[in-house]
């Protein structure tokens, strides 16, 4: 069954290029597109940087026709700044706007951005709702299982984000506390996918180190 984000048809087994700081720049995206990426995202872009018109942030808005479909990923800790950033990003005409609720690095999370917002789910939901309202483009989310072992609320969180209008969710199978240690827990990603209330595409992320591993996880977890 073909996977769609609104009118964007990604095929039966879509492969997404995850947004990675200092990695998923235009040359790297071109390489991935050539080798079959079905959907790509830019490096994440700071809302504060875009509003200040900082050169490094503005440069990351550069996208090219051959990259489509492509999403621009944004991050930030303030709802109003993220709303303004959404309006700026929409003017560059990407196919999707993606929200980063998953970056675990201290300089991002300690400010309440990225995975930091997993400590305040009501704010996460409110921010998402304002972003959805601010654009006509599809909005997607990248996140983690939770802040730590005791807050793995991703099944509920995914439902709430769907209810305020996101059109797909990508889940990294670790908590923020884990960073990139241990194994990604794909059973929880599968629980989101198999939740009968979920109507939007659910994508898994974490430990996919080869084409064979991607097929294995697809067959095992259905994600």
Question: Could you say what each language-model-derived stretch is?
Answer:
Residues 1-223:
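Flavin-dependent oxidoreductase catalytic cores
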